[in-house]
Amino acid sequence: MRITEANPDPDAKAVPAAAAPSTASDAAAAAAATAATAAAAAAATAATAAAAAAATAATAAKAAALTAANAAAAAAATAAAAARG
């Protein structure tokens, strides 16, 4: 007895010719995806740079405040030592 496939797989669906993407549309989609990726990378880089600049500014402000506090403490200690003679 010879077995033949009389009933093809019902889940297999043929792709209509109109749905098949053309080379031009593939290239356009790839270009759009590349542009979107580049834009996202640029935005992430800008956000990272802004965060780094803010952190650097905050660190500089803290360092300046500590330096001023240390200078004031040193001046007070010097004045106290001078007052003691």
Swiss-Prot record:
GO cellular component: extracellular region
Main localization, broad class: secreted
Keyword Transferase recorded: no
Keywords: Antifreeze protein, Repeat, Secreted, Signal
Cleaved signal peptide residues: 1-21
Compartments, as annotated in UniProt: Secreted
GO molecular function: antifreeze activity
Domain of life: Eukaryota
Family: Belongs to the type-I AFP family.
Its biological purpose: Contributes to protect fish blood from freezing at subzero sea water temperatures. Lowers the blood freezing point. Binds to nascent ice crystals and prevents further growth.
Stated name of the protein: Ice-structuring protein 4
